Each structure stands twice: as C-alpha cells, then as structure tokens.
C-alpha cells in the first residue's frame, strides 16, 4: 500500500499560503480539499523524476476528507510538505475493515496505492503535499461515497 522511495527532494516549491493563492481546480468540496497546478520549474523537475507521469500538482487537505478511492489513477507519488498535525494517519480499508494505518513523514517521497479505499485522519491544520501520477482517462474521477457532486 505504501513504499518509501529514495529520490531527491524537490529543489523548489511554494509555501502553503502561496499555493492557496493559486486557482483550486478541484470540482468537489473546496472547503476540505484543493488541487493546484505546480509552477513550471517544479513541474520540469518532476517530469524528469517521474517520466511516466503526466500530472504534477499540489494537494491541500483539511479535516473531513471521507473514505475514498482515487479512481483516476492507481498509483500516486507523494511528497508531504506539511503533515497537518502530529498524528495525521493514512488508513486503507476493505469493506469497512481497516487494512493498514500509518503516519507518513514530511519531506520523503512515497509511492501510494490510491486504488484501495483510504482515508486521511486526525488532520489538525492543513496537510500540504506534492502529488504526481499518470492519469487514466478510462477511470473517471475521484469517488467520495458520502459526497454528492
């Protein structure tokens, strides 16, 4: 479900307040989640690091993210800039049963299985990270079972 990667740190990235000044392109509840395009310098670095990928974005998460499946991708490469609290946990689920729970460290690349239902719990402030993936046009959009679109 999670694999830590020994990859170089991004040479540049925006601070949280600068990210929030960008356009939030998320189509769902923008109070709890945001997606923002990375600037060109960071995108070029990420394209070199992940040549198979075509999406390079910042994510901003707040408390209240429901269990969900990222159905527009199977694998995500993430780099957490700000954890969002001291005990923020990523939890994977199978039919309501917990499979695995972990606290992901800041400033460490990881490969994340986004095709299994998961949740982000105990966010106290804002969780901010860089998210990289290959878009699957046949998969559709995020599925939040408890959120109407």
Walk through the language-model features, giving the residues of each:
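Short loop/turn segments at secondary-structure transitions that flank enzyme active sites
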Residues: 10, 82-85, 118, 136-138
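Double-stranded beta-helix
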Residues: 93-95, 124-149
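Non-heme Fe(II)/2-oxoglutarate
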Residues: 1-58
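Nucleic-acid-interacting cores, centered on viral/eukaryotic replication and modification enzymes
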Residues: 1, 67, 137
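Acyl-donor (CoA/ACP) binding surface of acyl/acetyltransferases
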Residues: 117-120, 125
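Catalytic core of non-heme Fe(II) oxygenases with the double-stranded beta-helix
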Residues: 51-115, 128
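Short beta-strand-to-loop capping motifs
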Residues: 6, 81, 132-134
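Short, charged, solvent-exposed linker or helix-capping segments at domain edges/interfaces
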Residues: 43, 48, 88-92, 141-145
């Amino acid at each position: 479900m999670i694999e830590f990667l020994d990859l170089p740190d991004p040479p540049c990235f925006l601070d949280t307040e600068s990210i929030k000044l960008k356009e939030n392109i998320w189509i769902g509840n923008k109070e709890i989640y945001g997606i923002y395009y990375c600037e060109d310098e960071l995108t070029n670095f990420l394209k070199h690091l992940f040549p198979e990928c075509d999406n390079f974005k910042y994510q901003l998460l707040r408390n209240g993210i429901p269990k969900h499946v990222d159905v527009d991708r199977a694998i995500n490469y993430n780099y957490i800039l700000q954890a969002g609290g001291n005990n923020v946990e990523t939890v994977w689920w199978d039919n309501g049963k917990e499979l695995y729970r972990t606290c992901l460290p800041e400033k460490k690349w990881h490969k994340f299985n986004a095709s299994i239902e998961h949740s982000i719990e105990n966010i106290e402030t804002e969780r901010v990270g860089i998210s990289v993936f290959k878009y699957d046009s046949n998969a559709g959009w995020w599925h939040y079972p408890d959120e109407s679109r």
